[in-house]
Amino acid sequence: VVYTDCTESGQNLCLCQDSNVCGQGNKCILGSNGEKNQCVTGEGTPKPQSHNDGDFEEIPEEYLQ
């Protein structure tokens, strides 16, 4: 399973993880209806502090190729 930190606005396949916020002045928008996750400019989104099952969605393998 691969997770990508949100760091830059417009970055695809970002997942808000670990701690702090999603990049500097960016927030993570979770994709829906087949859309990829993206970092967008906006107030930072707090990342989950725990790493329990279900905290993060897996990135579909077709996005990793």
From Swiss-Prot:
Answer whether the UniProt record assigns the keyword Transmembrane helix to this protein.
no
Q: List the disulfide bonds.
A: 6-14, 16-28, 22-39
Q: Which residues are glycosylated?
A: 45
InterPro entries according to UniProt: Hirudin (IPR024793), Hirudin/antistatin (IPR011061), Prot_inh_hirudin (IPR000429)
Extent of Acidic residues compositional bias: 55-65
Which domain of life, per UniProt? Eukaryota
By what name is this protein known? Answer: Hirudin-3B
Species of provenance: Hirudo medicinalis
- Which lineage ranks, top first, belong to the organism behind this chain? Eukaryota, Metazoa, Spiralia, Lophotrochozoa, Annelida
